[in-house]
């Protein structure tokens, strides 16, 4: 779970900083904010309907598809209207993952250790995400999105080893 947190926070921070380096800053920033809102709204719902593995897998796949589209199509059309849409797809996937790991965290760890585990994963993942601004600002054009894509694929692959929850959380009919 700690590596999934690290991947998610790194990718989230990276895409936030990349939005400021694109030619169409304002449309990309607006699209990024909209994808955050939509991702946060549907993330918890996906988790309760599909479970942790499936919902995180689908969300990582959305972010991978968005990163592939930005890399292959978007950078050649950075001033076009299609570029903010592609950024939205990549950001939507990682926003959903971010919401799901917050909601799912108490179910993955036993209740006695959930707060300690949350603090530990936050500390380590925030340390790891500190390199994202340097990668976004100092790397050539495809490198940041390739790292986004690779780390999203790593997070999706690690879902195979994620246990379904041992902790407990209050559920409601949604």
Predicted regions and their residues:
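Alpha-helical transmembrane bundle of multi-pass membrane proteins
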Residues: 1-174
């Amino acid at each position: 779970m700690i590596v999934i947190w690290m991947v998610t926070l790194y990718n989230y921070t990276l895409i936030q900083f990349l939005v400021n380096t694109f030619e169409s800053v304002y449309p990309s920033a607006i699209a990024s904010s909209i994808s955050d809102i939509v991702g946060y709204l549907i993330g918890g719902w996906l988790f309760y309907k599909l479970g942790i593995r499936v919902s995180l897998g689908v969300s990582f796949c959305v972010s991978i598809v968005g990163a592939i589209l930005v890399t292959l199509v978007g950078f050649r059309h950075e001033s076009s209207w299609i570029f903010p849409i592609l950024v939205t797809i990549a950001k939507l996937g990682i926003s959903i993952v971010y919401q799901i790991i917050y909601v799912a965290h108490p179910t993955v760890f036993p209740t006695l250790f959930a707060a300690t585990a949350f603090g530990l994963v936050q500390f380590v993942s925030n340390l790891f995400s500190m390199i994202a601004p340097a990668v976004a600002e100092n790397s050539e054009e495809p490198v940041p999105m390739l790292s986004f894509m690779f780390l999203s694929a790593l997070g999706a692959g690690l879902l195979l080893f994620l246990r379904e929850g041992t902790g407990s959380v209050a559920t409601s009919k949604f």
